Amino acid sequence: MENTENSVDSKSIKNSEPKIIHGSKSVDSGISLDNSYKMDYPEMGLCIIINNKNFHKSTGMASRSGTDVDAANLRETFMNLKYEVRNKNDLTREEIVELMRNVSKEDHSKRSSFVCVLLSHGEEGIIFGTNGPVDLKKITSFFRGDCCRSLTGKPKLFIIQACRGTELDCGIETDSGVDDDMACHKIPVEADFLYAYSTAPGYYSWRNSRDGSWFIQSLCAMLKQYAHKLEFMHILTRVNRKVATEFESSSFDATFHAKKQIPCIVSMLTKELYFYQ
């Protein structure tokens, strides 16, 4: 039988084995045009996937086995949603910043939205280039309303598969059963962002060497199933449940055995987001 490993997206951690627990639309469709983002521009938008697998020796960070599975899964998923997908592999921190700066300067006026996926090691508020850390704030700031005017008022989605600390979630038993155009001409520059983090602040984020990370597996599965049926926040809620209930780490090291994970969604979206009209 093929051996696979579960890892976490922090700078370093002992390996552990995986275990999965098995237990177009119009007003007539019920979508309010006043309360939902306009998604019928000529193009859906860009989806930038930054996939950092191999890191400079000086960083002391291990290779992220399984991340190529995530990148391929994401590419297929967002291409099916009609995004223009651009995959970038093993970027330094300088290259990440330069890429994001250049993308923000593009003309997005014919695009409905923007998606950026970051697959790497991380800490709270930080994503790692192959040669060192970058503040997430620096990456996302290029797309603020006052910096990227052609995306103003449009949804900007940042999906982040990375650790946010070194805490481990032991889980807890439960007996509940596992079952209009804007009237104002000014909007906050931080409006219309959504950050989908793979894990809660301070915690490890788990990744499987064969199947990819728990979070990206679940996100792609739920998007494939519900992208043409549900609003995006509802889809992300189902992602949270899938990660929380269907995955658990298995390790010979008791410290890393039977651990859980819950994604964390931070939304500054001002309207409902449907990937269909």
UniProtKB/Swiss-Prot annotation:
Residues recorded with modification N-acetylmethionine: 1
Entry PTM: Cleavage by granzyme B, caspase-6, caspase-8 and caspase-10 generates the two active subunits. Additional processing of the propeptides is likely due to the autocatalytic activity of the activated protease. Active heterodimers between the small subunit of caspase-7 protease and the large subunit of caspase-3 also occur and vice versa.
Residue numbers carrying Phosphoserine: 26
Localization of this protein: Cytoplasm
Modified residues (S-nitrosocysteine): 163
Biological process per Gene Ontology, one example term: regulation of protein stability
Propeptide: 1-9, 10-28
Region (Disordered): 1-25
Top-level taxon of origin: Eukaryota
The enzyme's E.C. designation: 3.4.22.56
Residues forming the catalytic site: 121, 163
A Pfam family assignment: Peptidase_C14
UniProt modified residues of type N6-acetyllysine: 11
Catalytic activity entry: Strict requirement for an Asp residue at positions P1 and P4. It has a preferred cleavage sequence of Asp-Xaa-Xaa-Asp-|- with a hydrophobic amino-acid residue at P2 and a hydrophilic amino-acid residue at P3, although Val or Ala are also accepted at this position
InterPro entries xrefs: Caspase-like_dom_sf, Caspase_cys_AS, Caspase_his_AS, Pept_C14, Pept_C14_caspase, Pept_C14_p10, Pept_C14_p20, Pept_C14A
Activity regulation info: Inhibited by BIRC6; following inhibition of BIRC6-caspase binding by DIABLO/SMAC, BIRC6 is subjected to caspase cleavage, leading to an increase in active caspases.
Gene Ontology cellular-component annotations: cytosol; death-inducing signaling complex; nucleus
Similarity annotation: Belongs to the peptidase C14A family.
Subunit structure of this chain's protein: Heterotetramer that consists of two anti-parallel arranged heterodimers, each one formed by a 17 kDa (p17) and a 12 kDa (p12) subunit. Interacts with BIRC6/bruce.
Function: Involved in the activation cascade of caspases responsible for apoptosis execution. At the onset of apoptosis, it proteolytically cleaves poly(ADP-ribose) polymerase PARP1 at a '216-Asp-|-Gly-217' bond. Cleaves and activates sterol regulatory element binding proteins (SREBPs) between the basic helix-loop-helix leucine zipper domain and the membrane attachment domain. Cleaves and activates caspase-6, -7 and -9 (CASP6, CASP7 and CASP9, respectively). Cleaves and inactivates interleukin-18 (IL18). Triggers cell adhesion in sympathetic neurons through RET cleavage.
Name this protein carries in UniProt: Caspase-3
Gene: CASP3
